[in-house]
Regions:
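Conserved AMP-binding/adenylation subdomain of ANL enzymes
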Residues: 289-316, 324-370, 385-386
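Structural core segment of the AMP-binding/adenylate-forming
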Residues: 161-245, 368, 375-376
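Conserved AMP-binding/adenylate-forming
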Residues: 300, 399-401, 408, 413-427, ...
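Conserved AMP-binding A3 loop
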Residues: 112-118, 260-262, 268-292
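Adenylate-forming
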Residues: 189-208, 344-348, 367-415, 427-438, ...
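Conserved AMP-binding/adenylate-forming core of the ANL superfamily
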Residues: 29-33, 80, 98-157, 174-179, ...
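AMP-binding/adenylate-forming catalytic core of the ANL superfamily
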Residues: 144, 169-194, 365, 372, ...
Length: 718
């Protein structure tokens, strides 16, 4: 019998009706209640997900200000304990906790590695006891330098289960970038990999490990994960331990291990701002706030169910990420609700010599992924590469696509939808498969006329939201470990738009007067606190850096730094960073619209625009483009680019100059570095505007530095 896959948000609304007597005719009404009665809404989330605490909380929220709100004071939780709740029922259902592949194993055709729920629990207990034996106590920091492998999840859960504070950097980061982060938090333990595989290359990181050990005097212990030579790993760090040995215990003490009950606001992890200028800001989130917001987001809005629950039986969740991006944390959160997590470690685009954007799709086909998420740039690259998803294996289990990281263009979304229509048709032709309206292959995302769950009938008919695939486009941030805007399987799905503001998120577009506007582009603000907002920045006395980062423009109101339009129907469009805005002759626009126009051209692989504004002078706006191999930016190509902008946007946004470049500078998380390049071209020195170690491609900066010098000398540009 297939799972019905009723929308998770529908089940929650039915529960509200049956247990609270609350009935909402529209999502807008539900959202309005969630942001005006914070205590009632977040208490309902606590109760709906049956979050456990040995002690009661005496208030849902006290001092509801930003910063400074206190949530569920008196309650005790533990992220790892919430994960362990699913060990027995998921194991009884025969479902794994984690399925994983790397580049080599996928290419060789090997089966995925499988980590069962009981084995996950045993390894976590073993490592936790080892950390405790090394002197790790609640509040101590444990730093990790690990790739996206199951061992990283184990290390995280072991750390937080005993009250340690986790902090993670990806092993593609260099020594300086890692030390810029870890030195600020003085970790006592380092768990690290001595090698990483990316783009077909096995990269030795043993030198970096030695440099990290030397550069972190606070360290008392090192644990090394070695993919190739576990026996030799201990030779790397004197007094260190092998990861396999630290997770090998299987005795009465590991069987009896129980995660600590911790205060709701006990520090969980430390994540970092992008670090484009100065030292990265170490952002501290708490156990309880992260846990409760992750459940609400992942389940209600991403529609990712528990893998052993009848409504979502067999759910398999994948969101591609490196460990340097907060979406690794989002992938990890699948375990909170008993969802099987499918993870891939490596380059989703193949190798430099042999690009292959089918890699992740073949991975998803082999593992039977049901929810497939990635950065918006991944889908755009797939489209530009011209791949055919119907030739990537059986993808019919995928019922939802998730995107984030940057705005997803309407063109890319339409391409993906058309691809899945072909996937569906190809499946019918291959084996006569006819996709059901409801089930694991829930292509149409329909629940109209479906039998209601126990407790009452459905409140109203649910319309189809996206044939033949549902897109869950979200926008949030590392800053608060969550999302402000995202999906709802019951709402209309319009290409290029996100469906709604999320429950509990009092998000608005504010104009220059600080007033909310509809149908206009404004500053994205959040006027009410969220449980997952930062507890503080590590070492930030008096919250000086925290306040200047989010609350300097509007005291007491979170300014996120994005341009947002809320449409009359309640959907949302993100137009890019508000600090990288184009303002041409009084007409303001986010950069994403221009990128959509330019990058829709098959000749263009990537692009970046900056608007250089001056007092008393017209702005100067150069456009930088990466063209396909063999193409040259001649007069005809410039005319093509300008015409695309003129047609799609307005003649006002035609750039003053266009320049062909080899690469667009990007952060480690893949975001275009518009603001640093803008500052560089306005005359600031490169060392003041960008941290090269926080970049994915720092070598490309040399061209922009030379360009800025030529521009300053009057040789190019205005």
């Amino acid at each position: 019998m297939t799972a019905p896959h009723l929308p998770q948000i529908r089940l929650y609304q039915n529960w509200l009706r049956d247990t609270r007597g609350l009935q909402f005719d529209t999502y807008d009404a539900l959202w309005e209640w969630s942001v005006t009665d914070l205590a009632a809404f977040w208490q309902s989330i606590w109760d709906y997900f049956e979050i456990e605490s040995p002690t009661p909380h005496h208030a849902v929220v006290t001092n509801p200000t930003m910063p400074g709100a206190q949530w569920f004071a008196g309650a005790q939780v533990n992220y790892a304990r919430q994960v362990f709740r699913h060990v027995a029922p998921a194991s009884a259902a025969g479902l794994p906790a984690v399925l994983s592949h790397g580049e080599h194993s996928l290419k060789s055709g090997s089966p995925a590695r499988e980590l069962s729920w009981p084995e996950l629990q045993r390894q976590v207990a073993s490592l936790a006891l080892h950390l405790r034996a090394q002197g790790v106590r609640p509040g101590d920091r444990v730093a990790a330098y690990l790739p996206n492998i199951p061992e990283t999840m184990v290390a995280f859960l072991a750390t937080v289960s005993i009250g340690g504070v986790w902090s993670l950097c990806a092993p593609d980061m260099g020594t300086s970038a890692v030390l810029d982060r870890f030195k600020q938090i003085a970790p006592t333990v380092l768990i690290a990999a001595d090698s990483v595989t990316y783009g077909g290359r096995d990269i030795d990181r043993s030198d970096v490990l030695a440099e990290l050990r030397a550069g972190l005097p606070s360290l008392r212990h090192v644990i090394v994960h070695s993919a190739s030579d576990e026996a030799g790993a201990t030779n790397l760090i004197a007094g260190g331990a092998r990861f396999t040995w630290a997770t090998s215990r299987n005795d009465a003490e590991t069987a009896a291990f129980d995660p600590l009950w911790l205060p709701f606001d006990h520090p969980l992890w430390i994540v970092y701002s992008s670090g484009t200028t100065g030292l990265p800001k170490p952002i501290v989130h708490g156990h309880g706030g992260t846990l409760i917001v992750a459940l609400a987001l992942k389940v209600l809005h991403n529609d990712i169910g528990c893998s052993y629950a009848p409504n979502s039986f067999g759910e398999r969740y994948h969101w591609y990420s490196s460990t340097g991006w907060v979406m690794w944390n989002a992938q990890l959160s699948g375990l909170l609700n008993g969802t099987t997590c499918c993870i891939f470690d490596g380059n989703p685009g193949g190798t430099k010599e042999q690009p292959d954007w089918t890699t992740l799709w073949r991975f998803a086909a082999q593992l039977g992924v049901t929810f497939f998420g990635a950065g918006a740039a991944f889908f755009a690259n797939c489209m530009k590469a011209g791949i055919d998803l119907s030739g990537c294996g059986d993808l019919r289990n995928i019922r939802a696509l998730g995107t984030t990281g940057s705005p997803l263009s309407e063109e890319t979304q339409r391409w993906g939808t058309a691809q899945f229509r072909q996937v569906q048709q190809h499946g019918v032709e291959e084996d006569g498969f006819s996709p059901p309206q409801q089930g694991p292959r829930d292509w149409l995302c329909q629940t109209a006329g479906a039998a209601a769950p126990s407790g009452g009938s459905a409140l109203h008919e649910v319309k189809s939201v996206g044939e033949p695939i549902w897109w869950c486009n979200i926008s949030g941030g590392t800053d608060f470990a969550g999302a402000f805007i995202g999906g709802n399987r019951e709402l209309p799905l319009v290409p290029g738009e996100m469906q709604c503001r999320l429950l509990g998120c009092a998000v608005y577009a504010w104009n220059e007067a600080g007033q909310p506007v509809i149908g206009e582009v404004g500053e994205l603000v959040c006027t009410q606190p969220l449980p997952s907002m930062p507890l503080y920045f590590w070492g930030d006395t008096g919250n000086v850096r925290l306040i200047s980062s989010y609350f300097d423009m509007y005291p007491g109101v979170w300014r996120h730094g994005d341009w947002l339009k809320v449409t009359a129907s309640g959907s949302c469009i993100i137009y890019g960073r508000s600090d990288a805005t184009i303002n041409r002759h009084g007409l303001r626009m986010g950069t994403s619209e221009l990128y959509s126009a330019i990058e829709a051209l098959p000749e263009v692989l990537d692009s970046m625009v900056v608007d250089l504004e001056y007092l008393g002078r017209d702005s100067y706006m150069p456009l930088f483009v990466v063209l396909r191999d063999g193409l040259v930016l001649d007069a005809a190509m410039k005319a093509t680019l300008n015409n695309a902008i003129r047609t799609a946007l307005s003649p006002r946004f035609v750039p003053n100059d266009i320049f062909q470049v080899a690469e667009i500078p990007r952060t480690l998380s893949g975001k275009k570095q518009e603001l640093p390049i803008k500052k560089l071209l306005l005359g600031q020195p490169i060392e003041k505007v960008v941290n090269r170690d926080a970049m994915a491609n720092p070598a490309c900066l040399d061209w922009y530095v030379e360009f800025a010098a030529r521009r300053a000398a009057g040789q190019v540009g205005a």
